[in-house]
Swiss-Prot record:
It comes from Klebsiella pneumoniae subsp. pneumoniae (strain ATCC 700721 / MGH 78578). Keywords: Allosteric enzyme, ATP-binding, Glycerol metabolism, Kinase, Metal-binding, Nucleotide-binding, Transferase, Zinc. It comes from the Bacteria. The lineage of its organism: Bacteria, Pseudomonadati, Pseudomonadota, Gammaproteobacteria, Enterobacterales. Pathway: Polyol metabolism; glycerol degradation via glycerol kinase pathway; sn-glycerol 3-phosphate from glycerol: step 1/1. It is an enzyme of class 2 (transferase). This is Glycerol kinase. Key enzyme in the regulation of glycerol uptake and metabolism. Catalyzes the phosphorylation of glycerol to yield sn-glycerol 3-phosphate. The keyword Nuclease does not apply. The gene is glpK. GO terms for biological process: glycerol catabolic process; glycerol metabolic process; glycerol-3-phosphate metabolic process. Its EC number is 2.7.1.30. ADP binds at T14, R18, T268, G311, G412, N416. GO terms for cellular component: cytosol. Glycerol binds at R84, E85, Y136, D246, Q247. Sn-glycerol 3-phosphate binds at T14, R84, E85, Y136, D246.
Amino acid sequence: MTDKKYIVALDQGTTSSRAVVMDHDANIVSVSQREFEQIYPKPGWVEHDPMEIWASQSSTLVEALAKADINSDQIAAIGITNQRETVVVWERETGKPIYNAIVWQCRRTAEICEQLKRDGMEEYIRKATGLVVDPYFSGTKVKWILDHVEGSRERAKRGELLFGTVDTWLIWKMTQGRVHVTDYTNASRTMLFNIHDLDWDDKMLDALDIPRAMLPEVRKSSEVYGQTNIGGKGGTRIPIAGIAGDQQAALFGQLCVKEGMAKNTYGTGCFMLMNTGEKAVTSTHGLLTTIACGPRGEVNYALEGAVFMAGASIQWLRDEMKLISDAFDSEYFATKVKDTNGVYVVPAFTGLGAPYWDPYARGAIFGLTRGVNSNHIIRATLESIAFQTRDVLEAMQADSGIRLHALRVDGGAVANNFLMQFQSDILGTRVERPEVREVTALGAAYLAGLAVGFWQNLDELQEKAVIEREFRPGIETTERNYRYSGWKKAVKRALAWEEHDEA
């Protein structure tokens, strides 16, 4: 145990940068948050200004320490968690970006992805990187910058330009250009990293014409990478000692560090990750294979599945359908009826993600009869989030052969007790909701704290992890399967809607 009293987690997200100060009992002492500009140069293109990312993140660090009235010499370490896949390319000499950050949501590299498919790279990419060919991942974004900024590829070959995901960019700035690193979890989202050899993949670098000289060193998620003196009063150099991409940080924050443990984050969409231990499981059900953190930040593997519409479907009830005036009201109205009266809502507004991967599916409401009212539709919309989660979990169990015993949950929608109970009912599994909801920041703090001895081991952290509420299945297996079969029938009818229309 150190005499330093606090850990700071920097949580660099897609729309805001946050700093969270935690004490030795993993209690939150102070939080600072700043939003920054979203740049949309063309339809489907999304950018951030890397200097604004840096300015917003560094100012939240200073603010969070000032709010808590803490000197930098009281901080044991800083941990970083970040929006994944987003790309920055900058000059080694000046630290100046040569282009805006291209954000994970940006679709501009769709044609590069199509070319990779035409070149027969799809199967290799799945096996080597664990990913599917999609503009979502970093590699094609780096290629796009090198293709479109004059002279940049030659400069990169000469070692004048550097590439990094957001974690790498922040650490470069925090250490005044002394440290150029990333961690295994972020590297595994680039489509440039071989998740089996744990090294940058030469075949992928050649395919995208990306010089190796511009890539960061890849390190464990929990170790000291460098020191920073940013943070206001005290002037002491603070170790930067933890890095993980946001979903992997949440998995670690939920202490899902053993094979078969899983968490689901309920945000705009859902991200479910299951730790598969030391073996990388190749999915045959449309899931991603990715790197997660083991008990000491070492490499573990995970399966990841994404649901596109979770919280977004509740926003649709509020903003477009005007059935509720606040997202929190959905629980109240859903519990005014005893069931959905046979209604199923399939919220495939932008197609369906894992395990269907059908961009042509469209949203639909099935089972309407004269007795159906708005409460039934609200309830069915909430239930659709739980059904989609079961779809992903079934794919995970089929790929891994692991039976889930409990699902840990986080994100905005977990405050909805009706949804959490129905989730448990439809999975036939315990659902555990933690007391501390800031699990992404918690994961980054844990990784940093373990690296510097602020916490000794995971047993110490387990003692601090309080499950605020546990939901247990309250329906019989026959009822569960009957309801789920109705969902599957509804999804089947919503698939390929657009294609059917065009035929």
